Amino acid sequence: MSSLLKTDFNVSKYRLIAQKREANAVEIEAALEVVREFIIKKKLILYGGIAIDYALHLKGSSIYPEGERPDFDMFSPNHVEDAYELADILYEKGFKQVGTVRAIHVQTMRVRTDFVWVADLSYMPPNIFNTIPTLTYKNLKIIHPDYQRAGLHLAFCFPFDNPPREDVFSRFKKDLQRYNLIEKYYPIPVVPVKSIYESKTFSIPFKQVAIHGFAAYALLYQTLNELRITCKVPEWKTEFPQPSYSYHKNDKNITLTVDMPKAYPALVLATYNPEEVIKEMGLHLTEICEPYMDYSPPIFKTNDIHFFSTMFKELAISIIQDNLIVVSPQYLLLYFLYGAFATPADKSLFLFYYNATLWILEKADSLLNIIQKQTSPEEFTRFANTSPFVLTTRVLSCSQERCTFSPAYRISLANDVQQSQLPLPKTHFLSNSLPDVSTLPYNYYPGKGKDRPTNFSYEKNLLFNIGGKCTPSAM
């Protein structure tokens, strides 16, 4: 029997070869150079894989092989007009089949030439665009890795987002590798912050909500401490917060008493339908905050409790103690990063808690290693699958069979309804939640006879109200 030749499965190597041998490789490279000059001129901010790669280049590392064709993803405070302008520039320079189309991600416009995508421009509200930290690599502005972390945590928080290529299958491994590189080369310094704590008591529903924010940190810390005692590990010396909590419950409610920072005494909960829960709890809605990019959802505030909406999403959760529902550590990390971005005055406090949560995960990992050595593989698997400290696909339930409805799905459904002129039944869950597709950006193809679209309004479309602005409630 003849032996098979050993095959080199270096995917990156063959991708580079394929790119260089494409029939239109020269034209694509020329178009990408035009895009690069446009980014520099407009002072747009690169994000995503290319921003991570360039940030790592500044530290002598990378995630992409040298010479790989750049995939330009960029933030812009005026992404629609910028995308149209870039398309016009490419067309005027003689490139063929130039077009700008709305991407699946509704806040993104894609620019192509010769049916090859050369740029993705995503919307970032001016109040965020003008304040986020950046680095510079070869005259290109790139988003700082501190901000990039948020996008990496996001995939772990909503494992079933982006069907049929759910994040649990398409992003978990890649994003974990990228996060570890960012943590290695751009760690967030630990700067202790002294806080005054006060004991607060809250009564909350048992099944409809997940405990979030500083209270979730307290529950995860004490759960870690109990696991340490079980493993007979000496108490750790740490500068990180060590808040305590207690609770009792009945069939419907939990009474939770927890140490909270005096500066942030409100309890934070995550729930699929905040307005319904607020009504059932008999609370008074005082303020509503719009999303902060993809990193914080709409927030519904009452005097003592703030509700983070998970509407249209399936949030990963942890179960601790006697079936207490807590957000996953990844969502908690995202919360502390969001707090650092959105409230500069307390940035140091939120980053301290961010590092404290990372410390909890690090210590939990060491305890899990001990348990793994002391138990059979089957026993350890069962234990790990119920641990609140590992990545999970356990999600917060909603009131209908399906919970994940991305903006792209709702836009597609709205288009179907508009074309068929048949409204959804009033009993349909999304009957009052379809976007007005007439307010979305239009596709544009220079040289095709139609004028460039004008007067797109960010204010008139709720899908673009993502600057984190809070307004008093009329309720």
From Swiss-Prot:
Induction: Expressed in the late phase of the viral replicative cycle. Keywords: ATP-binding, Late protein, mRNA processing, Nucleotide-binding, Transcription, Transferase, Virion. It is found in: Virion. GO terms for cellular component: virion component. Coiled coil: none annotated. It comes from the Viruses. The keyword Transcription applies. It catalyses: RNA(n) + ATP = RNA(n)-3'-adenine ribonucleotide + diphosphate. Disulfide bonds: none annotated. Its EC number is 2.7.7.19. GO terms for biological process: mRNA processing. Its main location: virion. One of its GO terms (molecular function) is poly(A) RNA polymerase activity. It is an enzyme of class 2 (transferase). Belongs to the poxviridae poly(A) polymerase catalytic subunit family. Highly divergent. Polymerase that creates the 3'-poly(A) tail of mRNA's. This is Putative poly(A) polymerase catalytic subunit. It comes from African swine fever virus (strain Badajoz 1971 Vero-adapted).
